[in-house]
Amino acid sequence: TYSGLNTVLRNSNMPLLNLKHEITEMSLIELPDELKNFSITIMDGPFFSIMPFPSRKLNTFSHVRYTPHGSWIDKDEYHNGYEILKDYEKKSNFRYMINDAKRYIPLLEYAVYKDSIYEVKTVQVKNETDDGRPILFTKDYEIKNFSNIMGGKIDNIYEILDTIKETKEFLGVKKRHFWNIFS
């Protein structure tokens, strides 16, 4: 729950991390029959992605330009992302998303909008202009044995182990012994 990372720091009277938060929308759609068994991600230009959402028997639909609804940075001043999201007037950008995406895949014109999921997405400010999501790892942040860990991509679960392994000591456990815990 990265959007709450600065909440912990603020409540602990520690300096905030330089994080950017965005209110994001994932549209839930029903695909036309011809596309039902496909996941699609266009990686060039104003890209979009369609992925299965099995719990609702639908697909998520996101678009790099229209998924973000608004953003803020709380390096110097704290903003509670969950409160902002709760009070945010949720108006879907689905129509903009689909109008752009159907230029690439005309069958998407027949996708049916069902609902949207809104959430707070958090990234490091230094990656605001690209899609990089390197691991944020601050060992002994302000006090000994207090660390922050944030990874923005699924494969970060493996990278964080390497990052921790590279430190001489973490949580008082020698590097070699700590790594064996995961073997």
Per-range role (PLM):
Residues 99, 103-183:
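C-terminal catalytic lobe of FAD-dependent flavoproteins
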Residues 64-68:
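Short, solvent-exposed aromatic-acidic interface loops
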Residues 1-42, 53-58, 170-174:
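Central helical "cap/lid" subdomain
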Residues 1-2, 20, 90-98, 157:
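A structural signal for well-ordered alpha-helical scaffolds and beta->alpha junctions
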Residues 56-60, 144-146:
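A generic structural signal for beta-strand entry/edge sites
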Residues 56, 69-121:
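Flavin-binding catalytic cores
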